[in-house]
A protein has these predicted regions:
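Short coil turns that delineate tetratricopeptide repeat
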Residues: 30, 64-67, 101, 130, ...
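Hydrophobic/aromatic packing residues within the alpha-helices of TPR/SEL1-like helical repeat arrays
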Residues: 56, 93, 125-127, 156
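Canonical tetratricopeptide repeat
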Residues: 38, 72-75, 109, 138, ...
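TPR alpha-solenoid repeat register
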Residues: 35, 69-72, 106, 135, ...
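Terminal, low-structured helical/coil segments at or just beyond the last alpha-helical repeat
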Residues: 129-183
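Register position in tetratricopeptide repeats
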Residues: 45-46, 79-82, 116-117, 145, ...
Protein backbone atom coordinates (compact mmCIF):
# COMPACT_ATOMS: atom_id res chain seq x y z
CA UNK A 1 0.00 0.00 0.00
CA UNK A 2 2.85 2.39 0.79
CA UNK A 3 4.40 1.70 -2.64
CA UNK A 4 1.07 2.36 -4.33
CA UNK A 5 0.64 5.61 -2.42
CA UNK A 6 4.21 6.72 -3.27
CA UNK A 7 3.72 5.95 -6.99
CA UNK A 8 0.34 7.68 -6.95
CA UNK A 9 1.79 10.82 -5.34
CA UNK A 10 4.67 10.79 -7.83
CA UNK A 11 2.26 10.61 -10.77
CA UNK A 12 0.16 13.44 -9.35
CA UNK A 13 3.28 15.54 -8.82
CA UNK A 14 4.40 14.98 -12.42
CA UNK A 15 0.99 15.72 -13.95
CA UNK A 16 0.44 18.82 -11.83
CA UNK A 17 3.95 20.20 -12.21
CA UNK A 18 3.17 22.06 -15.43
CA UNK A 19 5.94 20.32 -17.30
CA UNK A 20 6.15 21.35 -20.90
CA UNK A 21 8.49 20.68 -23.72
CA UNK A 22 11.60 22.87 -23.54
CA UNK A 23 11.48 25.95 -25.76
CA UNK A 24 13.87 25.78 -28.65
CA UNK A 25 15.61 29.04 -29.36
CA UNK A 26 16.41 29.47 -33.01
CA UNK A 27 18.84 32.10 -34.11
CA UNK A 28 17.45 34.29 -36.87
CA UNK A 29 20.08 36.73 -38.03
CA UNK A 30 17.55 38.96 -39.80
CA UNK A 31 15.38 39.44 -36.72
CA UNK A 32 18.44 39.89 -34.55
CA UNK A 33 19.74 42.53 -36.96
CA UNK A 34 16.51 44.52 -36.67
CA UNK A 35 16.64 44.13 -32.91
CA UNK A 36 20.18 45.56 -32.78
CA UNK A 37 19.19 48.39 -35.13
CA UNK A 38 16.28 49.30 -32.86
CA UNK A 39 18.54 49.16 -29.81
CA UNK A 40 20.94 51.49 -31.64
CA UNK A 41 18.12 53.92 -32.35
CA UNK A 42 17.15 53.86 -28.67
CA UNK A 43 20.75 54.57 -27.70
CA UNK A 44 20.71 57.53 -30.09
CA UNK A 45 17.60 58.88 -28.40
CA UNK A 46 19.40 58.57 -25.07
CA UNK A 47 22.52 60.24 -26.56
CA UNK A 48 24.73 57.21 -25.98
CA UNK A 49 26.54 57.45 -29.30
CA UNK A 50 29.32 54.89 -28.94
CA UNK A 51 26.85 52.17 -27.95
CA UNK A 52 24.58 53.15 -30.86
CA UNK A 53 27.49 52.85 -33.30
CA UNK A 54 28.32 49.40 -31.95
CA UNK A 55 24.70 48.24 -32.23
CA UNK A 56 24.47 49.44 -35.84
CA UNK A 57 27.72 47.63 -36.63
CA UNK A 58 26.35 44.42 -35.11
CA UNK A 59 23.17 44.79 -37.18
CA UNK A 60 25.26 45.22 -40.34
CA UNK A 61 27.32 42.12 -39.52
CA UNK A 62 24.21 40.02 -38.89
CA UNK A 63 22.62 41.04 -42.17
CA UNK A 64 25.48 42.04 -44.48
CA UNK A 65 24.03 42.34 -48.01
CA UNK A 66 20.34 43.09 -47.90
CA UNK A 67 18.12 46.07 -48.42
CA UNK A 68 17.82 46.35 -44.64
CA UNK A 69 21.59 46.67 -44.45
CA UNK A 70 21.24 49.94 -46.34
CA UNK A 71 19.01 51.21 -43.53
CA UNK A 72 21.53 50.12 -40.92
CA UNK A 73 24.41 51.77 -42.79
CA UNK A 74 22.40 54.97 -43.19
CA UNK A 75 21.69 55.00 -39.45
CA UNK A 76 25.38 54.46 -38.76
CA UNK A 77 26.26 57.28 -41.15
CA UNK A 78 23.78 59.64 -39.52
CA UNK A 79 25.33 58.85 -36.15
CA UNK A 80 28.83 59.56 -37.44
CA UNK A 81 27.60 62.83 -38.96
CA UNK A 82 25.97 63.82 -35.71
CA UNK A 83 29.11 63.29 -33.65
CA UNK A 84 31.33 65.06 -36.19
CA UNK A 85 32.96 62.35 -38.31
CA UNK A 86 31.77 63.16 -41.84
CA UNK A 87 34.48 61.09 -43.58
CA UNK A 88 33.28 57.93 -41.84
CA UNK A 89 29.69 58.91 -42.54
CA UNK A 90 30.48 59.34 -46.23
CA UNK A 91 31.56 55.71 -46.53
CA UNK A 92 28.36 54.56 -44.81
CA UNK A 93 26.10 56.66 -47.04
CA UNK A 94 27.88 55.53 -50.21
CA UNK A 95 27.52 51.90 -49.13
CA UNK A 96 23.83 52.44 -48.38
CA UNK A 97 23.28 53.86 -51.86
CA UNK A 98 25.16 50.93 -53.43
CA UNK A 99 22.99 48.45 -51.56
CA UNK A 100 19.68 50.21 -52.21
CA UNK A 101 19.78 53.28 -54.38
CA UNK A 102 16.07 54.02 -54.32
CA UNK A 103 15.83 55.85 -51.02
CA UNK A 104 16.07 59.60 -51.54
CA UNK A 105 17.07 60.19 -47.91
CA UNK A 106 20.39 58.41 -48.54
CA UNK A 107 21.21 60.84 -51.34
CA UNK A 108 20.28 63.82 -49.19
CA UNK A 109 22.50 62.57 -46.37
CA UNK A 110 25.42 62.00 -48.75
CA UNK A 111 24.99 65.46 -50.29
CA UNK A 112 25.01 67.00 -46.82
CA UNK A 113 28.13 65.01 -46.01
CA UNK A 114 29.86 66.29 -49.17
CA UNK A 115 28.95 69.84 -48.14
CA UNK A 116 30.39 69.28 -44.67
CA UNK A 117 33.60 67.88 -46.15
CA UNK A 118 33.84 70.80 -48.60
CA UNK A 119 34.02 68.64 -51.73
CA UNK A 120 30.73 69.68 -53.32
CA UNK A 121 32.33 71.36 -56.35
CA UNK A 122 34.66 68.46 -57.13
CA UNK A 123 31.78 65.99 -56.90
CA UNK A 124 29.65 68.17 -59.17
CA UNK A 125 32.44 68.14 -61.78
CA UNK A 126 32.69 64.35 -61.53
CA UNK A 127 28.94 63.83 -61.88
CA UNK A 128 28.34 66.42 -64.63
CA UNK A 129 29.21 64.07 -67.49
CA UNK A 130 27.48 60.98 -66.12
CA UNK A 131 24.42 59.55 -67.85
CA UNK A 132 23.21 57.53 -64.86
CA UNK A 133 19.90 58.78 -63.43
CA UNK A 134 21.19 58.13 -59.91
CA UNK A 135 24.19 60.36 -60.55
CA UNK A 136 21.78 63.02 -61.81
CA UNK A 137 19.95 62.86 -58.48
CA UNK A 138 23.20 63.51 -56.66
CA UNK A 139 24.17 66.27 -59.10
CA UNK A 140 20.84 68.05 -58.62
CA UNK A 141 21.09 67.86 -54.84
CA UNK A 142 24.65 69.16 -54.86
CA UNK A 143 23.67 72.04 -57.15
CA UNK A 144 20.86 73.02 -54.81
CA UNK A 145 23.13 72.83 -51.77
CA UNK A 146 25.85 74.88 -53.44
CA UNK A 147 23.43 77.73 -54.09
CA UNK A 148 22.58 77.07 -57.75
CA UNK A 149 19.00 76.28 -56.77
CA UNK A 150 17.48 76.94 -60.18
CA UNK A 151 20.03 74.74 -61.93
CA UNK A 152 19.51 71.94 -59.40
CA UNK A 153 15.74 72.12 -59.68
CA UNK A 154 16.00 71.94 -63.48
CA UNK A 155 18.34 68.93 -63.25
CA UNK A 156 16.03 67.04 -60.91
CA UNK A 157 12.90 68.04 -62.84
CA UNK A 158 14.44 66.82 -66.11
CA UNK A 159 15.28 63.56 -64.40
CA UNK A 160 11.69 63.16 -63.19
CA UNK A 161 10.41 63.77 -66.72
CA UNK A 162 12.92 61.38 -68.32
CA UNK A 163 12.50 58.62 -65.72
CA UNK A 164 8.88 58.81 -64.49
CA UNK A 165 8.76 55.11 -63.58
CA UNK A 166 11.65 55.09 -61.10
CA UNK A 167 10.56 54.25 -57.56
CA UNK A 168 12.47 57.26 -56.28
CA UNK A 169 10.74 59.77 -58.61
CA UNK A 170 7.81 60.61 -56.26
CA UNK A 171 10.25 61.43 -53.46
CA UNK A 172 12.22 63.70 -55.82
CA UNK A 173 9.02 65.48 -56.88
CA UNK A 174 8.07 66.03 -53.24
CA UNK A 175 11.54 67.42 -52.54
CA UNK A 176 11.23 69.76 -55.54
CA UNK A 177 7.90 71.04 -54.20
CA UNK A 178 9.53 71.80 -50.85
CA UNK A 179 12.51 73.54 -52.45
CA UNK A 180 10.42 75.66 -54.83
CA UNK A 181 8.06 76.63 -51.99
CA UNK A 182 11.01 78.17 -50.13
CA UNK A 183 12.01 80.35 -53.08
Amino acid sequence: MKKFLAIFLLLIAVTCSGYRKPYKYTIDAGKDAFYHNNVGINYLKDRIYYAAIQEFKIAIQLSPNTQATAIFKNNLGETYTFIGYPEMARVCFEDAIKLYGLNFKYYQNLAECFRTLGITNTKMKELANSKSPYDKIMLGLLQIQSGAIRKGVITLDDLCNQEPNLLITPAIRQYLKEVTAKI
